[in-house]
Design a protein with these regions (language model features):
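Early extracytoplasmic/lumenal segment of secretory-pathway proteins
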Residues: 1-36, 42-44
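GST-like domain detector, emphasizing the conserved glutathione-binding G-site
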Residues: 36-39, 48, 65
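Active-site acidic carboxylates
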Residues: 44-51
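Exported/periplasmic ABC-transporter solute-binding proteins
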Residues: 2-6, 18-19, 25-27, 52-54, ...
Length: 202
């Protein structure tokens, strides 16, 4: 989504699955080449809020054929080459959180590459798990919920940090309407809907 916005896609409000993508559009961070490497100034900085929190989960196909129960067990299975795991590419947030989990367990991605399959986004990873093409996958709690997948473990903040979804209004001719909608998304009524699909308030 960040790339589409950067390339000029029509967008009034952006909710990102990680701060990294929002930072790259935030003009208040121009000069910080790590956070905003292209010097973009596309969001209304004052509108930016941390809207939601998600969890990074370990999910399994129906029946859990490998009997996977935890990230601890997954780490051992990966090191022994005894599991097929679906993960997101390193340029998407779910993949970035996964690499933090690998780092936490001292797993070298290249050393276990033959036991990994990749998705260009979290939906592709979810599909691989749903179809039983892999033994397990690392996806968000919300995606597991919508696909009716079994979650066997959730990553802690220590393992991969918190999964915060920032939201911000994009600069343009619809800033007032987008700001009103963003305010609505922070109400109790909206949060009830978010919580029903696996999110929590940030």
């Amino acid at each position: 989504l960040k790339t589409q916005i950067q390339e000029g896609a029509d967008c009034d409000l952006f909710i990102s699955a990680a701060p990294t993508q929002m930072n790259a559009l935030d003009g208040s961070l121009i000069g910080d080449t790590e956070k905003n490497p292209d010097g973009l100034d596309l969001i209304v900085t004052d509108s930016r809020v941390d809207l939601l929190e998600n969890k990074v989960t370990l999910t399994v196909p129906e029946g859990n054929p490998k009997g996977i129960e935890s990230f601890d067990q997954l780490a051992e299975l990966l090191k022994n080459g005894d599991v097929m795991l679906a993960i997101g590419n390193s340029d998407v947030p779910v993949g970035q959180y996964t690499l933090k989990i690998f780092n936490y367990y001292g797993i070298d991605e290249t050393a276990v590459a033959n036991k990994l399959t990749y998705g260009n986004n979290v939906k592709e990873v979810t599909s691989q798990v749903s179809e039983g093409a892999v033994d397990c996958g690392i996806i968000y709690a919300t995606d597991a919920h919508s696909a009716n997948l079994t979650v066997v473990d959730s990553a802690t903040a220590e393992m991969c940090g918190q999964v915060i979804y920032p939201a911000a209004v994009l600069k343009g001719d619809k800033e007032d309407a987008a700001q009103d909608f963003l305010a609505y998304l922070q109400t109790d009524a909206a949060m009830t809907v978010f919580e029903s699909v696996g999110f929590s308030a940030a």
